[in-house]
Amino acid sequence: MTKIKLIALDMDGTACSFHQGIHEANIMPIIKAQEMGVRVIFATGRPVLTSLSEAIKVKMDYFHQYFIGFNGACIYDIKTHTIVHQQTLSTSQVNFLFQLAKKYHKKLWCYTDDLTKVIVNFNPVAENNPELAFFDGEFIQYDSALTIQNKSYKCIVMDVHENDDFIIAARGQNIEIAIDASGTAEINAPEISKLAGLKWISSQWNIALSEMMAIGDSMNDYWMIKNVGLGIAMENSQEQIKAIAKEVTTTVETGGVAKMIEKYILNNRK
């Protein structure tokens, strides 16, 4: 098997318990892999700034790793605290999505391109929306009488499915959409994905996709799991992910990530 030089980890449902921190079993294997010279990065749909504490917990700042946030729309240098690569939804696309959400009575949450603000068309605090776990910045309430001036790294729409009128209309706008098992859709700029983020990092660090291991559980992990050298699905993955993975590990709650790092990195090198 090709030597693994980089491990890309999804966060929620993979390295981290759902909407929580890194599972305890995964911490030391991630650190040890980096000590052996293997690059380890998070590739997540989460926003960047509120997720950095988890990266720092496993010394990704010390080992000067990158962080793929918003499904690949923003790549962040954890050590220097700078954005090194980005691609956003345009202001016209963001305005269109809010108009569409109003038409079809959908809740929409958009992360703006300054990393500290979100635009919403509902009250997430009053509704105790689960996305609050990832954001502690400023909320801007959508006003249909005004034109939104912000670009967006990622928009989230709740309670949808593949044949939803909102999704059908949105897919005609040259955007990327991934819908998870809970019916939440993540919307990004065209050709944005975790795989696209890994391809950019590949060009910067001279690490081929065939030399990467990627672990994930949801549809926004599909393309990176399918295209890297060793794509691994969690036992708690959606079935479409298990179908294209080269291996299925155990669940997030049983340290499935740790088991794969130990098998392919820690126990495979003398």
Predicted feature locations:
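Mg2+-dependent phosphoryl-transfer enzymes with acidic/Ser/Thr/Gly-rich catalytic loops
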Residues: 2-6, 23, 185-270
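Asp-based phosphoryl-transfer active-site loop
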Residues: 3-19
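Active-site phosphate-binding/coordination module
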Residues: 24-125
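Anion (oxyanion) recognition and catalysis
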Residues: 31-34, 102, 171, 226, ...
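Short active-site oxyanion
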Residues: 37-41, 63-65, 153-155, 210-212, ...
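Residue-level detector of anion-binding/catalytic polar loops
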Residues: 39, 107, 176, 230-231, ...
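Short, structured coil segments at secondary-structure junctions
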Residues: 63, 71, 170-174, 227-228, ...
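Conserved acidic, metal-coordinating active-site core of Asp-based
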Residues: 100-215, 219-221
